[in-house]
Amino acid sequence: MSKKQQGYNKATSGASIQSTNASYGTEFSTETDVQAVKQANAQSEAKKAQASGAQSANASYGTEFATETDVHSVKKQNAKSAAKQSQSSSSNQ
């Protein structure tokens, strides 16, 4: 086998490993940052709830299953939400 062929084989095997990682790498990863995933899910749910105006749904389901809820940030978000609601209700009168 010439050096040229060895280089080609290395290049193709590397490419196939990368494509395998692209399709399976994160799906079955053992080092998933669970807290980051939960936080991202909670943020996604909060955005959906705000967009649809269903903030009460977020209050009843959003934090119910969280293991490490940041109480301070939840209170802060609730205060913002209450402020927005009072602004919109006063402008509607």
Curated annotation (Swiss-Prot):
Biased amino acid composition, Polar residues: 1-33
Domain of life: Bacteria
Site feature: Cleavage: E27, F28, E64, F65
Biased composition annotated in UniProt, kind: Low complexity: 38-60, 79-93
Keyword flag Repeat: yes
Annotated spans, Disordered: 1-93
GO biological process: sporulation resulting in formation of a cellular spore
Sequence repeat extents: 18-52, 55-89
Keywords: Repeat, Sporulation
Pfam families: SASP_gamma
Family listed: Belongs to the gamma-type SASP family.
Functional description taken from the UniProt entry: SASP are proteins degraded in the first minutes of spore germination and provide amino acids for both new protein synthesis and metabolism. These proteins may be involved in dormant spore's high resistance to UV light.
Name this polypeptide is given: Small, acid-soluble spore protein gamma-type
Gene source species: Bacillus cereus
Lineage summary: Bacteria, Bacillati, Bacillota, Bacilli, Bacillales
